[in-house]
Regions:
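Aromatic- and histidine-enriched alpha-helix N-cap/loop-to-helix transition segments
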Residues: 48-59, 138-142, 178-181, 247, ...
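Non-catalytic C-terminal accessory modules of carbohydrate-active enzymes
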Residues: 197-330
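Well-ordered alpha-helical scaffold segments within catalytic/enzyme domains
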Residues: 1, 56-74, 143-156, 185-194, ...
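Extracellular polysaccharide-recognition and catalytic grooves
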Residues: 97-98, 109, 135-234, 238-241
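Active-site acid/base region of carbohydrate-active enzymes
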Residues: 1-52, 70-110, 114-144, 156, ...
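Hydrophobic core segments within long, regular secondary-structure runs in both alpha-
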Residues: 1, 58, 65, 78-92, ...
């Protein structure tokens, strides 16, 4: 970013007015109610804007907190830590239950029942249905992915949340329902709570909606929609907005680097970093690299006849800690 770009940290936080604690329309402190695209192009359309917007508000405050820490801005760090905790508390009060599950009202689709409505100032009516565990319309994969990956679930509830999160995948037969907001957080959140096996199952799914469905049907680029083309019926998604080269769902690539290859920074700029490769599902080989400020970091592994072989590149003037899948640390 150049020095005149108003999106840089310094300008955004000079007077505190650029990063609001809540929408002007909010009736509950720290809950975000502004209209937005939400989990765009999701398959189940069940994650309310207010839920995802509040989760992302907390995440934004957390990013600012960490940025302030790196820059040595202690007053800002304190301010954004407090803001994060306040939004987290409001998020939990609104949507996280005592048993670690989440529940909320979501927009009604053609598949859900009408159980409530709200009327806007212009007279338009939005119908809602209640989404909770053990009901026909359970909370979405995105709902759990955001809550877990943004550290919004209290630690004493996380074990139970893990169970409900896993169920959000299994009840859809190991297929995806996430849209643009949930896609980059789904696999990392699953790994965060020890559900790597579920993440690999999603990765290898070939039925629609999945990453490999498009590959199986000849795709060489990432589609905008999970159903940009349905081979079984020979039909296309909404042609008014249906790109066959739209990388949003390719956000799973981050998890390839951080978890399958296992490259994670410990110190800023990868002065020190972790190498903690993972294997799972039917995957027997992985290799990748990127150029850090100190030089090329690479990680490669393969499985053959039950033997795990690993190779890596560590740049000069950096330190890496290697954690192998069997738990050995070097």
């Amino acid at each position: 970013q150049n020095s005149t770009d108003r999106r840089n940290y310094g300008v955004r936080t000079v007077d505190g007015k650029e990063v609001p604690e809540q929408s002007d329309l909010a009736t509950i402190p720290y809950i975000q109610v502004q209209q937005c695209r939400g989990d765009h192009l999701t398959y189940d359309n069940s994650t309310p804007y207010i839920y995802s917007a509040t989760a992302y508000a907390a995440h934004s405050a957390d990013i600012l907190r960490r940025t302030a820490y790196i820059l040595g801005k202690t007053d800002d760090e304190k301010r954004y830590t407090e803001l994060f905790e306040n939004i987290k508390r409001a998020f939990n009060d609104a949507w996280v239950n005592d048993d670690g599950s989440v529940s909320y009202y979501g927009e009604v689709s053609s598949q859900t029942a009408h159980c409530g409505e709200s009327v806007a100032l212009d007279g338009s009516v939005t119908r809602y249905t209640y989404y909770a565990e053990n009901t026909p319309h359970c909370p979405s994969q995105t709902a759990y992915a955001l809550a877990v990956d943004f550290d919004l679930i209290p630690k004493d509830k996380l074990k139970n949340t893990r169970k409900y999160f896993k169920n959000s995948i299994l009840r859809n037969n190991g297929k995806l329902t996430v849209g643009f907001l949930g896609i980059s957080h789904l696999a990392p959140a699953l790994s965060k709570v020890g559900l790597d096996d579920v993440a690999f199952k999603l990765l290898e799914q070939e039925d629609n909606p999945s990453w490999l469905y498009s590959v199986k049907n000849g795709a060489t680029t990432i589609w905008e929609r999970w159903n940009s083309y349905i081979a079984e019926t020979g039909t296309f998604g909404d042609v008014s907005m249906n790109s066959f080269n739209h990388y949003s769902y390719g956000a799973i690539g981050q998890w390839f680097f951080t978890d399958i290859l296992g490259i994670r920074p410990v110190e800023f700029g990868y002065k020190s970093f972790m190498l903690s490769p993972k294997f799972g599902g039917g995957l027997t080989y992985a290799k990748g690299s990127f150029t850090s400020p100190y030089g090329k970091i690479s990680s490669a592994w393969k499985l053959h006849d039950g033997k795990f072989t690993y190779d890596c590149t560590v740049p000069t003037n950096t330190t890496a800690t290697l954690k192998l899948p069997n738990g050995d640390i070097h």
